[in-house]
């Protein structure tokens, strides 16, 4: 068994453990390469069907190709696709660079706050109607208490301290000093009532592993990641005011 197979097996195991042990699960899908690999692994884990709702935070500043890709795959793969948005911040122009705040405040309003209140059910959520091919108000306002996320330990320092099953407080706060030990594939899956849980099936993957797996599995990804003949491509994807292409022939 090669290294990619080992990573895949562990991720599939964690996804199945999460689904078996936790209610009100959701999976974040940023439309980027990491969360798309996570989505692919979820399809493998459940034999082509993803029984977990996909959640996307739409800032309204995403590059158009990203939204087109999201909705196309959601229809092709029959995904339960939900998005949330901070519409009040957009209306009040608490945005960057065309509004009244800097990029950090914009990111907090359109991403962090939107995510928190979307998961809690306090703000409206919109679900894809596969028949009409439009998003409609989701009548289910029950909070998501477990969220599957495609973070990797090698991305930055704080994430290297994460766990596969990482508890948060009721306010979604992370206490790095109060994380359960995880040894020899033994994971804690029982937590106190009210605990919000983050699940990280890609924790041991590196960026190189992600690209190797995308190539091996022929996973469809956003075309922006690749040079379209102009010597430019995006290494990471996000909102267009803060995302830039790099020189590359890849």
Where are each of the predicted segments found?
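Nucleotide-activated chemistry modules centered on ATP-dependent adenylation/adenylyltransferase
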Residues: 1-250
């Amino acid at each position: 068994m090669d290294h990619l197979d080992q990573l895949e097996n562990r991720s599939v195991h964690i996804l199945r453990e999460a689904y078996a042990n936790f209610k009100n699960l959701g999976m974040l899908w940023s439309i980027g390469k990491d969360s798309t690999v996570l989505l692919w692994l979820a399809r493998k884990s459940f034999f082509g069907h993803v029984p977990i709702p996909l959640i996307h935070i739409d800032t309204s500043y995403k590059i158009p190709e990203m939204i087109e890709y999201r909705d196309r795959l959601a229809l092709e793969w029959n995904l339960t696709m939900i998005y949330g948005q901070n519409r009040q911040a957009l209306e009040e122009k608490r945005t960057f660079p065309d509004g009244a705040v800097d990029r950090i405040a914009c990111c907090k309003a359109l991403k962090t706050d939107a995510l928190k209140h979307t998961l809690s059910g306090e703000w409206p959520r919109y679900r894809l109607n596969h028949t009409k091919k439009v998003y409609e108000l989701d009548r289910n306002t029950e909070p998501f208490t477990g969220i599957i996320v495609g973070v990797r330990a090698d991305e930055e320092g704080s994430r290297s301290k994460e766990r596969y099953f990482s508890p948060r407080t009721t306010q979604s706060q992370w206490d790095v000093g109060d994380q359960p030990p995880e040894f020899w594939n033994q994971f804690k899956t029982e937590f106190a009532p009210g605990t919000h849980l983050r699940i990280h099936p890609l924790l041991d993957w590196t960026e190189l592993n992600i690209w190797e797996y995308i190539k091996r599995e022929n996973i469809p990804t956003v075309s922006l990641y690749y040079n379209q003949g102009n010597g430019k491509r995006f290494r990471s994807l996000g909102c267009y005011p803060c995302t830039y292409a790099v020189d590359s022939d890849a």
